[in-house]
Each structure stands twice: as C-alpha cells, then as structure tokens.
C-alpha cells in the first residue's frame, strides 16, 4: 500500500514520516469523540450492553456505576456535574467514588469491526475500532490530505497525492524558457511579463535602439537621448519638460522668466521667515507660561512636603498615645493580679465558711442550754458574718475591675463596632417576658480623642417593631474629649446585621444624622436619646437564615470618619 510523500528542497518527492497519533489514556491509539459515544458504522449490530445509558451510542471509555450500568466517560462527567446525579437507567443515586473504569468492556468494544469512514469515497476496508485511527492516518488511500506544498491549500485523496504534487499543483516548480530559473507555475506568466531579466524589450521613449534585454533597460534609460528631463529651475516654479537638447535651449532663452521666478521664491521665503519669527514669539510666551506653571507646581510640592511632615508628627504623637495605652493596660493587669489572688482567697474563705456552717449545725444539735456552747455559737456566727461581708466587698471590687478590663479590651478607636451577642434565645425570651427589654453594647470611638458611642438593641422589637422585628439604635455617649469636638454630630452611620454563612449577605441600613435632633447634640447626661431603626429586620428573617450560629448574632456599626477633623 503506497504511503504519502513530501517534496524536498529540490522539488523531489520524499517518503512522508508517520503522522503523530493522539494516544488515548488506555490501550492503543483510538478515535475519541469530543462528547458522547462512537458514531462509527459497525459491521454487525452492536449489542445493548455496549451502549451508553445516556447517549445510547457505542460506549467511549466506558465507566460503570455501583448499580451496574455503563456510561461514556464524557456522559458520566456531565451527570456528575449536577448537584444530585442519578443513573438514567434505574434512577439510583450515583456516588462519584464508586464509579470505575470498565477496561474489560473497553477492550471488547475496540475489537468490534467497523467500516472505514471513507467508505463513501470508495474504501472497502473492514477493521477493528481500535485500528481505525491508524488506518485513517497512515493507510487509507481515500483519506483527504493537504497538499505537501506549503502555499497550496487544496486537499486531495492519498492515492492522488503524487499526481497532484507532480502534475496538477499550481505551486509546482516550472522552468522559465528565457532565464531557465525555477518559478512556481502560478507565477510563471507574471515572471515573464515583468521580472525576467532575459526577456527582449524595446525602449519606452522610442529612440533608435529597438531591442535590448530587460536587464539592460535601466542603464539605457539613463543615457537615452529621448528620455524626458525637467528644467533646473523646477524647484522655483518652472514647469518646462523636454529632451536634454530642448532643456538647454529653454534655459538659454528663458533667463528673464527664471529671474522673475527667483524673485517670487525669495518673496515667499521672506514671508515664511516672518511667520516663523511670529511663531517663535508665541513659543517663547508658551515657554514662559510653562515656566510659571512649573514654579507653582514647585510651591505646591513644598506645601505637600510640609503637610507630610505634619502628618508624620501626628503619627508619632499617635504612636506615643498607643504606647501610653499599652502601658496603662500593663498597669491594669498588675492591678488585677491582687484581685485574682483575692478571688482565690475568697474561694478559700468560702470553704472555711462552709466548714464553719457545718460546725454551727453540729453545735446547734448539742444541748442549747450549755452556756459554753452558746458562747461558741455566737462567736462563730459573728465570724461568719464578717467573712460574708469581706466576700461581698471582694465580689463587688472584682466585678468592677472585670467590667473595666472588658471595656478596655473590646474598645475600638476606628469608628467600627463589632458586637457579639451570645445566648440569643435566652435574652430574647427575657425581652418577651419584659425582664430585659434592651441591651447596650460596649463603647467604641471614632479615634483616641474622638466621639464616644455605643449601640442599643431590642431583641423583641420596640415601637412599630415590637413583637415582630429586631430594633437597632445608635447612641452618642458623653466622652472625655467632647469639648474639643464639633457639634452637632454629623458623621454618616451604617447599622448592619452580619450573615455568618458563606454567602455573606449582610443586612444593613445607613443614615446621616439630623443636626436638629437632640440625639446628636453634645451630651449633657451619660448618653443621648437613641436614634435608629425600630423595624431593622423581621424576626422571621433573622431566625430562619444564617444570621444566628451557636445561639450567637453579630451586629456591626460603622461610623464614617473620612471627613472628620482632628480635635
């Protein structure tokens, strides 16, 4: 069987190297359709066990499910891409990890006999499916192949390729009858008409020389007596053309005309010089304007540098403030340590009290008429009373220090509050029962010397939202540096309920303070009247979404500090 050929540099046909195949990740090199099963024409009717349960074509790279049904690899990938894949044959759920390659079935399918794809062009071959690609790539004489010449775009059957390349291809090499050079057949006529140096041509100026080679034409034109020429005063406006003899006669007889042309050209040149001078003046003005702009830019740059230096000094000041706060935290930690020790002592005292109470109980069971027992009981009761008083004092001091430490630990100084509310169900039930209608957050600040604020929430709603919504409010508190801040409060406020799910669909509302509202005046008490949203979010939305996790919700308050001046 004749293989395909290719041309070498001299135009001779050479054996064509074997074409590279696309290996399938299995046995051999086979045709793999992009989607679904094989569409080949099989010699015998294919059994149903070799057909895909989805596309009903012959299986390509068969995969078998746990339920025993087979699918093409691409069809299985399409099924597994759905959220709940099911077998199209029995509707059983498909588990990806339990789908496996059916290599036995694959080998049986590749051994099935098929007709060549070029049967319609005359190929009568019957071969196994696994050998079809090799047959089409290297053997089939009825496979269409591109011409071996790079410029030719025609496709011919493999059996006709040699004749096409040698006899019919428009880009085959042909020999010029004049210069004997090799030229593609499609370009031969153009070569002879315009390019061949050995073709005989005549002078285009119809001089006495009638025949000469195209290669000699250029040299002849430079010497031809009939070659047209122009007057040497052409650049000044003279349009006369003629032979060399006519040009000499013209220049001798037209001296006055040429002088006039020179005068006109000189006048035109003077006008151009004047225009250039005017343009030069305008350019100088533009240069001066640019110089002034550069000076103003330099002044602005110096001003920006000064602002930068001021900002650096502010940053240093803030760093010192931060260091000071860190020192205060360390001091607070030192102050808390004794209270921790007191707490441990209190625990010890509690055990002592319990022991004393046990002793009192024992003594009370003894004969109450015994005088000594009565005195001992009175002494023990007085000791017990003193211990209870000391424990109460310790409890109060520890609670106060714990509260102060929590406030300092959770305070934010950038205008952003993230408030974590635990035990949502219990706290909401207390609100429903009227025990604790609202909760206040820890304070937060717009800066170390800025506004002091907090949030207030009604878990069972307030006003219009009572019993149906969560109500959320913003509160201005009296701060240490209120005297240095601008009033009324004007910063934009954003209230937000945070979504704890992966979609992060937070619920939020924003408002600009009303300068006439008493809620945003300078506080005269501990805090102003709260302002916000009585119907911030419906309780059904809150409790049925992903806003509650581990019986906890998160509320976020953002105060815009971008235009806030330093105190």
UniProtKB/Swiss-Prot annotation:
Keywords: Apoptosis, Coiled coil, Cytoplasm, Endosome, Immunity, Isopeptide bond, Metal-binding, Mitochondrion, Repeat, Thioester bond, Transferase, Ubl conjugation, Ubl conjugation pathway, Zinc, Zinc-finger. GO terms for molecular function: identical protein binding; protein kinase binding; protein phosphatase binding; thioesterase binding; tumor necrosis factor receptor binding; ubiquitin protein ligase activity; ubiquitin protein ligase binding; zinc ion binding. Residues 266-337 form a coiled coil. It catalyses: S-ubiquitinyl-[E2 ubiquitin-conjugating enzyme]-L-cysteine + [acceptor protein]-L-lysine = [E2 ubiquitin-conjugating enzyme]-L-cysteine + N(6)-ubiquitinyl-[acceptor protein]-L-lysine. Undergoes 'Lys-48'-linked polyubiquitination, leading to its proteasomal degradation in response to signaling by TNFSF13B, TLR4 or through CD40. 'Lys-48'-linked polyubiquitinated form is deubiquitinated by OTUD7B, preventing TRAF3 proteolysis and over-activation of non-canonical NF-kappa-B. Undergoes 'Lys-63'-linked ubiquitination during early stages of virus infection, and 'Lys-48'-linked ubiquitination during later stages. Undergoes both 'Lys-48'-linked and 'Lys-63'-linked ubiquitination in response to TLR3 and TLR4 signaling. 'Lys-63'-linked ubiquitination can be mediated by TRIM35. There is a cross-link at residues 106, 155, 167, 328 (Glycyl lysine isopeptide (Lys-Gly) (interchain with G-Cter in ubiquitin)). Its EC number is 2.3.2.27. Residues 1-26 are annotated as: Disordered. Residues 414-559 form the MATH domain. A zinc finger (TRAF-type) spans 134-189, 190-248. There is a cross-link at residues 55, 123 (Glycyl cysteine thioester (Cys-Gly) (interchain with G-Cter in ubiquitin)). This is TNF receptor-associated factor 3.
């Amino acid at each position: 069987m004749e293989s395909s050929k290719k041309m070498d540099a001299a135009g001779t046909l050479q054996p064509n190297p074997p074409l590279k195949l696309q290996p399938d990740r299995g046995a051999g090199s086979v045709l793999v359709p992009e989607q679904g099963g094989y569409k080949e024409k099989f010699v015998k009717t294919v059994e149903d066990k070799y057909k895909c349960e989805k596309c009903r074509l012959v299986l390509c790279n068969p995969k078998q499910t746990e339920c025993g049904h087979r699918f093409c690899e691409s069809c299985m990938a399409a099924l597994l891409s759905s959220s709940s894949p099911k077998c199209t044959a029995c509707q059983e759920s498909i588990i990806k990890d339990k789908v496996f390659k059916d290599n036995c079935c694959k080998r049986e399918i590749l051994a099935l006999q098929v007709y060549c794809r070029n049967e319609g062009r005359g190929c009568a071959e019957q071969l196994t499916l696994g050998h079809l690609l090799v047959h089409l790539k290297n053997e089939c004489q009825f496979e269409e192949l591109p011409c071996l010449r790079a410029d030719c775009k025609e496709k011919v059957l493999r059996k006709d390729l040699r004749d096409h390349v040698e006899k019919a291809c428009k880009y085959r090499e042909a020999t010029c009858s004049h210069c004997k050079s090799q030229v593609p057949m499609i370009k031969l006529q153009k070569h002879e008409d315009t390019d061949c140096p050995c073709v005989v041509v005549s002078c285009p100026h119809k001089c006495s020389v009638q025949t000469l080679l195209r290669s000699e034409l250029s040299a002849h034109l430079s010497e031809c007596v009939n070659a047209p020429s122009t007057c040497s005063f052409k650049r000044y406006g003279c349009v006369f053309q003629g032979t060399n003899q006519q040009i000499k006669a013209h220049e001798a007889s037209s001296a006055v005309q040429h002088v006039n042309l020179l005068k006109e050209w000189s006048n035109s040149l003077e006008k151009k010089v004047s225009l250039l001078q005017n343009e030069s003046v305008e350019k100088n003005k533009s240069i001066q304007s640019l110089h002034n702009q550069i000076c103003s830019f330099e002044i602005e740059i110096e001003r920006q540098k000064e602002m930068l230096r001021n900002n650096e000094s502010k940053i240093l000041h803030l760093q010192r403030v931060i260091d000071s706060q860190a020192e205060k935290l360390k001091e607070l930690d030192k102050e808390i340590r004794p209270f921790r020790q007191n707490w441990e002592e209190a625990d010890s005292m509690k055990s002592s009290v319990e022991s004393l109470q046990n002793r009192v109980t024992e003594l009370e069971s003894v004969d109450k008429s015994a005088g000594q027992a009565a005195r001992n009981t009175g002494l023990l009761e007085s000791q017990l009373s003193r211990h209870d008083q000391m424990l109460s004092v310790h409890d109060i001091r520890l609670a106060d220090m714990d509260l102060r430490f929590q406030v300092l630990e959770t305070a934010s100084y950038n205008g952003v509050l993230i408030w974590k509310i635990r035990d949502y169900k219990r706290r909401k039930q207390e609100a429903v029962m009227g025990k604790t209608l609202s909760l206040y957050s820890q304070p937060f600040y717009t800066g170390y010397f800025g506004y002091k604020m907090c949030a207030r929430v009604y878990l069972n709603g307030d006003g219009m939202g009572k019993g149906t919504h969560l109500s959320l409010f913003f509160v201005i508190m009296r701060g240490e540096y209120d005297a240095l801040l601008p009033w009324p409060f004007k910063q934009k406020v954003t209230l937000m309920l945070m979504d704890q799910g992966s979609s992060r669909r937070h619920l939020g509302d924003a408002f600009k303070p009303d300068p006439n509202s008493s809620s945003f005046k300078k506080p005269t008490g501990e805090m102003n009247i709260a302002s916000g949203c009585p119907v911030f979010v419906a309780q059904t939305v809150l409790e049925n979404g992903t806003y509650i996790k581990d019986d906890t919700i998160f509320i976020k308050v953002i105060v815009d500090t971008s235009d806030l001046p330093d105190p």
